[in-house]
Regions:
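Juxtamembrane coupling segments of multi-pass membrane pumps/enzymes
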Residues: 65-66, 91-151, 182, 309, ...
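Conserved catalytic phosphorylation-site environment of P-type ATPases
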Residues: 63-71, 173, 273, 283-359, ...
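Bilayer-spanning, highly hydrophobic alpha-helical transmembrane segments
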Residues: 16, 232-262, 277-295, 574-603
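Transmembrane helix-loop-helix hairpins at the membrane interface
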Residues: 2-124, 226, 235, 242, ...
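P-type ATPase nucleotide-binding
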Residues: 339-465, 474, 486-502
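Membrane-embedded transport module
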Residues: 247, 508, 547, 552-625
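Conserved cytosolic catalytic loops of P-type ATPases
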Residues: 116-209, 313-356, 398-399
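Conserved ATP-binding TGD loop and adjacent catalytic N/P-domain core of P-type ATPases
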Residues: 401, 427, 433-575, 583
């Protein structure tokens, strides 16, 4: 509990004790009045002070004003009627403060969920000076510096491992508990926790530009983007509160005046009491507090799951998503070429890969890199001579004095070598040794492990259509789309063509359209869609800048989880709106008719607020979605 919350709690206890003393010992007269007024001032002083300040500043119509008018009015009515019953006035303030304390604690719990993410902020960086480790502020570490991260410490800046190996805990960033390995040459990002070995890292970004700073900035700014529901409640409260004050005044004055005109007793006490009850019931705090809290909790729950949403307006839009468009590479596929097959080989597969990897050793093309990875052995460039790259065809070279040709079917035709066609989907690399065909290698962009499951999960989450856009050839695109059960596929697209396809889908879509990309070269499409989702954004500034929703790892299943989180949050928001307005509307009518008394008004105010707040913090629970 905060210091302020403890103070309110002590005021609640003191007031409850004073009221209990008065009731238990049946203290009446002046002593009873003094004790009731003391209890009222103890519990209500803070509210009265806020109401007075609001009047001075011209901000009259808020919940403090309503509570002050209602309770002071109830005391005045008790004095006027000489009943000596000040219990209702004290009870209104007491239960209102209990409700306020409860919602303050709930907001604090929700805020702690978000600020738990702030634990990724590193407090220091270790640098070596004169053979000793010195702790410095991460802001003071220049790009290109060597920092040392010991087991149990957070990585303070993005960089590349130059020495050492370890496992990294990325749970605070991705929501996943599975550690990741890091060794020399691997890129690492700030915010991860080093678990086992000592790492030396050469920094590649200043602290202000590092991943941890970008994420914290995004989270801290998320509350500034209000949803339509929040804006509606804000506007509603500005109109609603003055309206009910006027309504209460009319209820207190008009019926007695009408009765006097009719020659009857004005019965002022009854109608003023009803008006005061009307004021207590009408307090809009259940809506004003629970709706923003629902979104705040939803954003916090999403953050814990590794889904960063830039504002509640995007959370609301995400909940209405009916069409999801994917960029293939890096989203549904891993975006890394791998050797998947070797066919028609006239020598052992390992030897085929060795010849191909050696012939391609001088090339930096992704296909060359994939051949070298598949071979896995040491590349001795001294074994390779007479390398000739034939543009658009492939490479010829001598490996250990043997003529080797590696390339596409055009290279085989050019050299007059008969080759075998391949029905596998992917890039086909043919190999010839001393003019004789030696087989071909199939290289493919591998589908992500959970991609098919992710498409099915989107359907279960209520997404009506899934679309895949790619610059790849039609045969490859159709194969991937068929394997994943994607509804619609468009291939051989340039970046401008992808924007055009999204424009067309937007015009046809019944509901909101989300575009999912890796955030690196998808900025135009991410910004054009109703909601842009960037995947695998750890370390990608472009993704964090361009997207509305950032998934911190490469798991496509997080997309459906993000949609389910948003829908749960909006469902809670609508439940609270309907519940609060329904109960208050009913009690307002009953209060005006004299059926609902001040105790019913207390439930309609504090009880409804507590129930709505309890419902709101359910948005934090996202583990089972």
């Amino acid at each position: 509990m905060t210091k302020k919350q403890k103070k309110v709690l002590w005021c609640i206890i003191a007031t409850a004790v004073l009221v209990a003393v008065v009731k238990l010992f049946s203290i009446g007269g002046v002593a009873g009045t003094v004790l009731y007024l003391a209890a009222y001032l103890i519990i209500g002083y803070d509210i009265l002070r806020k109401a007075f300040r609001g009047i001075i500043k011209g901000q009259v119509f808020d919940e403090n004003f309503l509570m002050a008018v209602a309770t002071v009015g109830a005391i005045a009515l008790a004095v006027y009627e000489r009943s000596g019953d000040y219990l209702e006035a004290v009870a209104v303030m007491l239960f209102y403060q209990i409700g306020e304390l409860f919602q303050s604690y709930a907001v604090g719990k929700s805020r702690r969920s978000i600020t738990a993410l702030m634990d990724i902020r590193p407090d220091y960086a270790n640098i070596e000076q004169d053979g000793k480790l010195v702790q410095v502020d991460p802001d003071d570490v220049a790009v290109g510096s060597i920092i040392v991260v010991q087991p149990g410490e957070k990585i303070p800046l993005d960089g590349v491992v130059t020495e050492g190996s370890s496992t990294l805990n990325t749970a605070a960033l991705t929501g996943e508990s599975l550690p990741r390995d890091a060794a020399a040459g691997d890129e690492v990002i700030s915010g991860c926790v080093n678990m086992t070995g000592v790492l030396k890292i050469r920094t590649t970004k200043a602290f202000g530009e590092s991943t941890v700073s970008k994420i914290l900035e995004l989270v801290e700014n998320s509350s500034s983007h209000k949803s339509r529901s929040e804006n509606f409640i804000s506007k509603f409260a500005r109109i609603y509160t003055p309206a009910v004050c006027i309504g209460a005044l009319v209820l207190a004055v008009l019926p007695p005046v009408v009765r006097l005109v009719m020659g009857l007793s004005g019965d002022w006490g009854t109608w003023v009491y009803r008006a005061l009850t009307f004021l207590v019931i009408s307090c809009p705090c259940a809506l004003v507090i629970s709706i923003p809290l629902s979104f705040f909790a939803g954003l916090g729950g999403a953050s814990r799951a590794g889904v960063l949403v830039k504002g509640s307006n995007y959370l609301e839009t995400l909940s209405k998503t009916r069409v999801v468009v994917f960029d293939k590479t890096g989203t549904l596929t891993q975006g890394v070429f791998d050797v998947t097959d070797v066919h028609h080989n006239t020598m052992p597969q390992k030897k085929v890969l060795e010849y191909a990897a050696l012939a391609e050793c001088a090339s930096s093309h992704p296909i060359s890199k994939s051949l070298q990875r598949a071979y896995g052995g040491e590349i001795d460039r001294h074994r390779v001579t007479d390398v000739q790259e034939i543009s658009g065809n492939g490479i010829t070279a001598k490996v250990d004095g043997t003529d080797v040709a590696v390339g596409n079917s055009k290279l085989m035709d050019r050299l007059g070598i008969a080759w075998h066609d391949c029905h596998s989907v992917g890039t086909i690399i043919h190999l010839a040794i001393d003019g004789q065909y030696a087989g071909h290698i199939v290289i493919s962009d591998v589908v992500k492990p959970h991609a098919k499951e992710a498409i099915a999960a989107l359907k279960q989450a209520g997404v009506e259509k899934t679309v895949m856009l790619t610059g790849d050839i039609r045969r490859v695109a159709d194969h991937v789309a068929g394997e994943l059960c994607v509804d619609e596929v468009h291939s051989e697209l340039l970046p401008a063509d992808k924007v055009a396809q999204v424009e067309r889908l937007l015009s046809d879509a019944d509901g909101k359209l989300a575009f999912v990309g890796d955030g690196i070269n998808d900025a135009p499409v991410l910004s054009r869609a109703d909601i842009g989702i960037a995947m695998g954004a750890m370390g990608s500034d472009a993704a964090i800048e361009a997207a509305d929703v950032v998934l911190m790892d490469d798991d496509p299943l997080k997309i459906s989880k993000a949609i389910r989180i948003s829908r749960k949050c909006l469902r809670i928001v609508y439940e609270n709106i309907v519940f609060a307005l329904g109960i208050k509307g009913l009690c307002l009518v009953l209060g005006a008719m004299g059926i609902a008394n001040m105790w019913a008004a207390i439930f309609a105010d504090v009880g409804v607020m507590v129930i709505a707040v309890l419902n709101a913090i359910r948005a934090l629970r996202v583990d089972n979605l």
